[in-house]
Amino acid sequence: GVRFPQGPPFMPYFVYMLLSKYKSKFISYVGYTNNLKKRLILHNTSKGAKFTKGKKWKIIYMKKFLTKSEAMRDEYILKKDYKLRKTIKSNFLKK
C-alpha cells in the first residue's frame, strides 16, 4: 500500500506586515511565521521582536507559502521594498 510520512500535520508559512501608530506617525514591521495568531499575540506583548515591544500592532498584509524558504525569500524582498510597503500601508489607511 501507499505509505505517508509520519510527523506533524502540514503547516503553511505566512509573510505578514504589521502597522502601529507611534508618536503620531504610522510604522510598519515585516516578518514570517507558521502561526500568525500566536505571532501577533507575541508582538503585542513584551515577548515580540525588539522593535515591536511596547506598541499595539495590526496585521495589514499577509501572504501564504507552502515552504519556509519561500516565506523567508518573500519576507526579505518585502523588507527591502519600501515603495511596496508604503503602498500597502496607504491602501490600508484609506479604508
Predicted regions and their residues:
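GIY-YIG nuclease catalytic motif and its immediate N-terminal context
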Residues: G1-K55, I59-M62, E70-L84, S90-K95
